[in-house]
């Protein structure tokens, strides 16, 4: 018994020893786990999720996330525990580890390379959704037993390791949403067991390797949102098990391979947002299991195969934003009852919506927007009772909206805007109880708004702007508790604003402007505390504002202008978040509230045309973002507060027609952006402060109707950008400075009713843009009328009356074709008026005792009454001599006539030509025939144009007229007749310059092919290649008297803009010496037969004005064109590359907006640049912003619209006031090229939910 006890004791001792011998391995795992925990950082404020990982609890197999097999650790699953810190390299010491999952934490740092030590055991490694960084270790390629590798959604970079091709057992590889670059390894073709490959949302590039076709087990392949390019490999057709293929939003090109029709298992195919072209392969319609097909945002062409409508498994068909053609067939959904979503917007579909659309009974979403569909909306469409989203906007649909719409009880979003629908909005919309968005704007709907709209209790947005709706706004709208946006502008609504709208507490936008509403604003509007935008301008609303509006503390933009409100505006001052505030043209009274100064981000403040009294609040100085201040036509008094000088972003100040007093503040001269200063009709005194003459950006300066004294200083010539100057009705004295001639952009000059003296400076003739008026009347000017006034080519009104001018009236003034109003009355003028002045009334010349001739009384031909009269004999002799002289003169005229015609005939027949082989001159050609089929002869040109008959004229400008000449050899050329009086062929400098220009060749420059001269006055010809499609000006601004061309599409306009910039860049950088164009404008941008841009008339400014003649007409002729001239040219009279860039910027604006820079809308207050700049600052999506884009460009894609705004941003950079702030032509060209290359954008994201 004792022996047995001893043996039992020895057994337990040995067993204990055996356990003790195993402890070192277990202790190592325990230590490794603790090291791993220590690499994680625990937030002391959060619960320690790994609190059981401690040495006091040695049974680690029971620890959180630890899985053991026997006593060996085979799994670590710490997913989603919120761990931070890094992954310890010690993790590589778990020799038997099969599964690692540390996903969905916040771990940082690199992936440990020591993981490669687990090559014999590890089967799954999941590290996705962390913050891991650095390259993916190539050592992971040694984990040959790995079946699942998920590293996506980290901050990894670098390339995909080639060694991953060694993971031959891999079934899942997920690397999405990192920053991986480089190529997809071709060695992936070795992964024959791979079932899932997810590479999307990286920066991978290059083609898909053909070897991917070897991965025959692949069921899901997603590589969307990368930079992959090239063509799609036909080898993809070997993936017979593939169910999901997502390659969207890359740069794949070429055609869709028809071999994709071999993917017999495919259910989801997404190629959105590439550059694929050609036809949609018909074989895709053979994919019997296909449920989702997205080919949108490509360049696919052709018709939609009818077989698509017979694919009975297809649920989602997305073909939007392609260049497809044709119409919807009557066979639509003939064998498809599964189709749920159909996106065909922007596919150039035409024709009518077929009645058979009702076959698509499962449709939930139908998008046919942005096409050219016509006809009526078929009643059968409203049988699609499952519809939740119906988009028919931006088409040419007509007719009425059927009452059958009541069937669509599941409808949530309904857009019909930009069509030609008419009639009443049916009351049956009240059955659409789930409707959330309803856009009917810009149609022709009429009649009253149906009261039943109040039944659509889920409505969030109503936009019916721009129709012909009449009657009152139904009070039932007040039942729409979820309504956030109500837009009814530009209708014919009448009556009161319903008080029930105050129940719509979620409302953020109310726009009821441009109607005929009356009554007052309901006090219930004080409950709309979420309201941000409140527009009710151009109505007949009246009364005091309700005090409850003080509760609207989130208002950012209001416009109450052009109504009949009165009382105080204090109720509007509860918000301190205003961006724009406009109550112009009402009857508001009292003091301007100080609280307006709390809106420091307020950009535009308009209080004009009211009855405000008191002083301008000093608190306005706190509005740091203020750019426009209009308080004109009120009854304000006192001085302009000095605090306004703190508003350094002010561009417009209008304080006209008040009772403001004191001197004009000197601090106005320190507002660097000020472009408009209007202080007219106030009580200002003192002299003109010299500080305001440092405002080099100012465009409008109106100081008239005050009591200013002193003289006009010489510094007035510093106002280089000034368009309009009005100093009339003051007490200014002294001479008019000659520096006035430096204001070359001046459009209007009014200095009447002062006490100015001295002579009118001859420099006034330098104001070549002066157009609206030159008014110097009611002063004390002396001396003669300067003849230079007659050189003002655009002047429409000239008033020099009530002065002390003497001498004769220059006859050239009577020849001014632009002059419509002339007043020279009440001066001391004398002499006989030339017959040109007979077109004005006598009132224009009265009060000048020594002046005679039509329209005044005839001049007295008899001499003085005291002069002795002639004898009869003397009269006979004088008569005889006069008769003989007249006969002799007549004979001389006849002789000269025949001689001149004879000489002219000889000159034309034997004219010189740069190309003529039978020239009467021995002169060699100026340069070789640049592109002409054969030598061009003078006689051929004369014959082709009937001696330059006006019938063949295709253009004219400052440098001369242009004729189209179709030569006998079938070639068509353009011939420019230069307005010149000398034979330029004999001028060596001219020859040298023309020869240089003739060697210039660029894709976007018009080729100069040669020069001809007849040695006759006015018959010097430059020969150019012919541009078959005229100029950009012709296309953009054709009127009813001009043959209307097709509309230039956006893609074409963008190419024209880029071509123009590249042409200018070539002139500036690649010509030696560089060429400054000096007259870039839309009429000089010519289009060839392919509508490709070519800049013409380059170099003419130099060769016709630079060195060869001092002819004034020519010098001004080639200095630029009105509306395109850079502001610095006014004072420097020097054209530079940067002035070319400015002109190019104006043309870019013209291309996008379709507007001329000289349109009537651009007056003395706002030129084209300022208009674009102002409107571009409005919120994205606003209607004002949309009007920047030419209305001819209907239905731009979002990516095209964005590109248009980008071009305008570039144009604004090009038209900066200071030349040094403008980009170079090379930079501008690069900017436009970037816009052109990045114009493609994705349409919709159609992705499957996949593991990362």
Swiss-Prot record:
Domain Protein kinase: 948-1232
Residue ranges that the UniProt entry lists as topological domain Extracellular: 23-876
Sequence ranges of the LRR repeats: 94-118, 120-143, 144-166, 168-190, 191-215, 217-239, 240-263, 265-286, 287-310, 312-335, 337-360, 361-384, 386-408, 409-433, 435-456, 457-480, 481-504, 506-528, 529-552, 554-575, 577-599, 600-622, 623-648, 650-670, 671-695, 697-719, 720-743, 745-767, 768-792, 793-816, 818-839
Localization (cell): Cell membrane
Expression sites by tissue: Mostly expressed in siliques, seeds, developing embryos and seedlings, detected in flower buds, but not in roots, leaves or stems.
GO cellular component labels: Casparian strip; plasma membrane
Residue positions where Phosphothreonine is found in the record: 945
PROSITE patterns on file: LRR (PS51450), PROTEIN_KINASE_ATP (PS00107), PROTEIN_KINASE_DOM (PS50011), PROTEIN_KINASE_ST (PS00108)
Protein name per the record: LRR receptor-like serine/threonine-protein kinase GSO2
Lineage: Eukaryota, Viridiplantae, Streptophyta, Embryophyta, Tracheophyta
